[in-house]
Amino acid sequence: MFALCDVNSFYASCETVFRPDLCGRPVVVLSNNDGCVIACSAEAKQLGIAPGEPYFKQKERFRRSGVVCFSSNYELYADMSNRVMTTLEEMVPRVEIYSIDEAFCDLTGVRNCRDLTDFGREIRATVLKRTHLTVGVGIAQTKTLAKLANHAAKKWQRQTGGGVDLSNIDRQRRLLALIPVEDVWGVGRRISKKLNALGIKTALDLSEQSTWIIRKHFNVVLERTVRELCGEPCLELEEFAPAKQEIVCSRSFGERVTDYEEMRQAVYSYAARAAEKLRGEHQYCRFISTFVKTSPFALNEPYYGNSAAVTLLTPTQDSRDIINAAVKCLDKIWRDGHRYQKAGVMLGDFFSQGVAQLNLFDDNAPRAGSAKLMEVLDHLNAKDGKGTLYFAGQGMSQQWAMKREMLSPRYTTRYSDLLRVK
């Protein structure tokens, strides 16, 4: 038995948690460089605002409608997500973190001692009490059915109270008949068009199809979906995310970059951040790549995009090694006279910690005290906020940095941003 817990309007809700004065007001969160809408509160959705709308086109409309806009505050969202997931892990045997705002919970054995509907309400109430975030809870025998139960819990929140137990077969069929096939987890628009052409309009229609025919005309993934809709678990709970095969750190610049020194600072920063992520995965890498590009949509400007890579003989997780390699790559591809829109650093060819081997022919031997130095660096930045300790090459002003002109405070991760109660 699975429960899918999904935070309602997560990004927007994180902003309103610390701003009770925004209760009942439309709130939107913008993408990198305040480009377009990526999240809306329920009040904003009622005004017809949808994700993907460019901010510069809607700015005047937002002002007239009293819409409150925020730049993306990823540090706040990550910490609030961690609080939600920690709460869930205390309440259920196992948890699979599916995304920043949703998780699958293992309810094996719970129904033997608890009513599942009551338990779903308890999960919802506990998360609300600890984080002031509202979650929808969908309970069913399979992940796909739990997704649909969660969809119903959020769509008909007033009738369901934010939680739906879909373990009853008759209730399953009634709900499946109401759900368009394109809303089924894993179906998507392209496949739904083919299904509609075959007369398969709803989730119930799909569940009644022969698995053999579905596999023959589509694929094994859709066959699993059909089996899951019929209550046959095909997707197991994954407590541990598979090891990453690569790490990419890149951003579009707040302003076009034309100066080499500014680009070098950006590559320094991206490489340092990528190295930090690498250590967080307890991995070493040998492959480091840097890319730069101009905007393909800029009028009367030639497009230029290029990348270069370095393969180290000895795997490393030291920020200094990764930064040096990334800057060498930049030197190979930098061309004067362009207005660069974006750059990034990619790491690959990973080795697990303790498995990486030295190379006799490598001139760059591992640095003495490297592991301890990186540990101190990560500890201070985790404790006092990202960027507390940084490399001089990253620069101080960082005029190229991503625009976040409406950034809210990092209420939960920076002492300087703690709320003051009067």
What kind of feature is each model-predicted range?
Residues A103-G109, S307-L313, A356-D362:
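Short, hydrophobic beta-strand segments
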Residues G109-V110, T142-A146, V292-A298, G348-Q353, ...:
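Short, internal active-site loops enriched in acidic
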Residues D183, I191-R339:
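DNA-contacting surface of Y-family translesion DNA polymerases
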Residues V327-K383, G387:
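C-terminal hydrophobic structural anchor segments
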Residues C23-R25, L133, Y284-I288, N306-A308, ...:
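A generic structural signal for short beta-strands and their flanking turns/coil linkers
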Residues E301-Y303, V355-N359, M402:
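Short conserved micro-motifs at the rims of enzyme active sites and ligand-binding pockets
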Residues Y98-E102, A140-K143, Q283-F287, H338-K342:
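Short Gly/Ser/Thr- and Asp/Glu-enriched loop/turn motifs at secondary-structure junctions
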Residues M1-R227, E236, A365-K422:
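Gly/Gly-Pro- and Ser/Thr-rich, intrinsically disordered tail segments characteristic of DNA damage-repair
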